[in-house]
A protein has these predicted regions:
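C-terminal binding/interaction regions
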Residues: 4-5, 10-19, 94-133
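A short beta-strand-loop structural module common to alpha/beta enzyme folds
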Residues: 34-45
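Short, structured active-site "lid" loops
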Residues: 51-73
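Short hydrophobic/aromatic-enriched beta-strand-loop microsegments
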Residues: 87-94
Length: 133
C-alpha cells in the first residue's frame, strides 16, 4: 500500500456530483488538506467521462497520489478514470469500503455517487480513504 506523503489531493465532478464535491472539498480544506479542484465552476463542468480521464491523468503523470471523483452514481467517472494507466479506481458507498479500497486494494482514486452518498458520509469516506495506510 502506497502511503500519502503529502496532504495534497485532486478532486473533480460532473454536474450531478458537483454539490457533493463542494461539501467534501470544504471539509478537507478545514482539516488542512490542499485541494486542487479540476471543476471549480458548476456551469463549466464537463461530462463525467472527461472529468474521470482528467483526474486519472493527474495521478498517472505523478502530480497527485490520490484523487476523489464525484458523479451521479460514481460508476461512470470510475470507468473513465480506470482507463488511464496506473489508476486503480474504486466506487464506494460506505466508510468501511472506502478504507478497504485504499488499504487492501491499493486504490488511488475514490469515486462517489451523489445520488447514493450523503455529504456527511462522503466526508467520512474521504477521511478514511486518505488516511488509510
Amino acid at each position: 500500500m502506497k502511503t500519502v506523503r503529502s496532504k495534497n489531493v485532486v478532486v473533480g465532478a460532473d454536474f450531478a456530483g458537483f454539490p457533493l464535491k463542494e461539501a467534501v472539498k470544504r471539509h478537507l480544506e478545514e482539516r488542512g488538506w490542499t485541494v486542487t479542484d479540476l471543476t471549480p465552476v458548476l456551469e463549466e463542468t464537463p461530462m463525467y467521462h472527461r472529468v474521470g480521464f482528467s483526474l486519472g491523468a493527474q495521478i498517472a503523470e505523478g502530480r497527485f497520489e490520490r484523487a476523489l471523483a464525484f458523479c451521479g452514481t460514481g460508476m461512470g467517472i470510475h470507468i473513465a478514470a480506470s482507463k488511464v494507466p496506473h489508476v486503480h479506481a474504486a466506487v464506494c458507498e460506505s466508510v468501511p469500503s472506502a478504507r478497504r479500497a485504499s488499504a487492501a486494494n491499493n486504490a488511488n482514486l475514490l469515486a462517489m455517487g451523489a445520488f447514493y452518498v450523503a455529504p456527511r458520509t462522503a466526508m467520512a469516506m474521504a477521511d478514511a480513504f486518505l488516511a488509510s495506510e
